[in-house]
Amino acid sequence: MNRLIVSTCLGLAFLGLHLDSHAGRYALMPDQVIDGVQETAQVDVAVLVEDARIASLVAKSDIPAGYERIDLQGMTLMPGMINAHEHPLLYDDNYQTAHLTASSAYKALLGLAVMQRWLAHGWTTIRVMGDGDVFYGNQDLQRVFSEGVFVGPRITGAAHYISITGGGGDINYGSPEQTLIADGLIADGPIEIRKAIRTEIKYGSDWIKLLVTGAFHSVGDDPRNVAFSPDELAEAVAEAARHNVPVAAHAHATEGI
């Protein structure tokens, strides 16, 4: 069963790339279709595609003339999957040092390969929840995908985490004499939080990510502690709302959640 699912996702993903680059009319004929609406998979159904977009589902016996028939025997068609929490540019397990050892361009190129691999496995939408990048590599990838320069999944999300000084998005392992650039945006107080959110939106983030508590993999903070004050959180949500941008929160422990 696992082999069937993997083969199906791979086959359909690459089929999708083919159809996307060859506008026309196709009738996809799998063994069954999961449409996300019916409670059970549908059999004897074809998916009609026009100009790289799904037009309708019809019985295989009712496929209109003029459609190129593509036999997908042994496969199941289903909607693309959504990964709602991902960090595509974290190429190293130690996310607190990875951004110091590679450029934003290098990580974007690695992210391109990663996202194309995810697309081939059936993930058609990726929500980025901050990443190990001091610039905006994911937003650049989103741009080249939307412009058709490269084929990749849809990207939404936040370029960075917004963290307090000493929080989960800060670098807390250096001595006071060292100046290290954090991969998060460090903001303290309503004014700095407002500016950080405006900066994120300016450069393409369509979500805001707040590190409301400490994290497990960062040095010098505690996942049980709430980082932002109520006033800071209220300002963050209000500022994002002014731009019609949703807010996501990293939160551990009862009080943080």
Name these PLM-found stretches.
Residues 75-143, 147, 231, 255:
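Metal-associated gating/positioning segment near the N- to mid-region
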Residues 112-137, 152-161, 205-218, 246:
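Divalent metal-dependent hydrolysis catalytic cores, especially in the metallo-beta-lactamase
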Residues 97-109, 175-195, 246-251:
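Active-site mouth loops of central-metabolism enzymes
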Residues 81, 143-169:
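Glycine-rich, aromatic-flanked loop segments that form ligand/cofactor-binding clefts
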Residues 24-26, 33, 37-78:
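Histidine-rich, glycine-flanked metal-binding segment
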Residues 140, 191-257:
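Histidine/acidic residue-rich metal-binding segments in metalloenzymes
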Residues 1-8:
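Bacterial N-terminal signal peptides that target proteins for export
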